[in-house]
């Protein structure tokens, strides 16, 4: 992802930034956009590890927040305090096998957590969304199983086949609504 370097100062919230993919996204923004303040919000569950970010932890434009995206009071307070201009939402329960043994945890984080973030974003900016962005990261698993050949596109019908993919499909629909 290449963005213009001349973009104004922003307060960017990245959820799930201590995870494998999230840490790469955090690092990219911390290093490439010194005029942004990057807030990494992560609950540090089994999938998050701050060791992934040792090289940027002392950067002037980087802040870590340990919090749960389903905690509405905390999330609302953070949005009010920091006035995030943009959100990149990567936080998720993402292990298919775990979703089968504990589907409620996946519904809570992936659906409710996304809704809490969306509501905080909406309530913070009310009717002034100009220049504000909410990027929601999903998974190809919402489309089901591909098989040996073929491909998925943005017009492929949803066909989730695990609690994980069903929870991500649901969160996709809330973001689009």
Task: Please give the residue ranges for each predicted region.
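N-terminal Rossmann-like NAD(P)+-binding domain of SDR-like oxidoreductases, especially those catalyzing
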Residues: 1-177
């Amino acid at each position: 992802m290449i963005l213009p370097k001349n973009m104004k100062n922003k307060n960017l919230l990245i959820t799930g930034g201590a995870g494998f993919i999230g840490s790469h996204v955090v690092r990219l923004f911390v290093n490439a956009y010194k005029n942004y303040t990057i807030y990494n919000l992560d609950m540090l569950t089994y999938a998050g590890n701050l060791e992934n970010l040792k090289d940027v932890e002392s950067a002037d434009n980087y802040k870590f927040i340990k919090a749960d995206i389903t905690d509405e009071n905390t999330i609302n307070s953070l949005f009010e305090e920091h006035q995030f201009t943009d959100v990149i939402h990567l936080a998720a329960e993402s292990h298919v096998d775990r979703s089968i043994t504990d589907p409620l945890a996946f519904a809570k984080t992936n659906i409710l957590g996304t809704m809490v973030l969306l509501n905080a974003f909406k309530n913070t900016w009310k009717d002034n969304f100009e220049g504000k962005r909410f990027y929601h990261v999903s998974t190809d698993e919402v489309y089901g199983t591909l098989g040996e050949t073929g491909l998925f596109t943005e017009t492929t019908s949803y066909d989730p086949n695990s609690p994980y993919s069903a929870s991500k499909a649901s969160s996709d629909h809330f973001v689009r609504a």
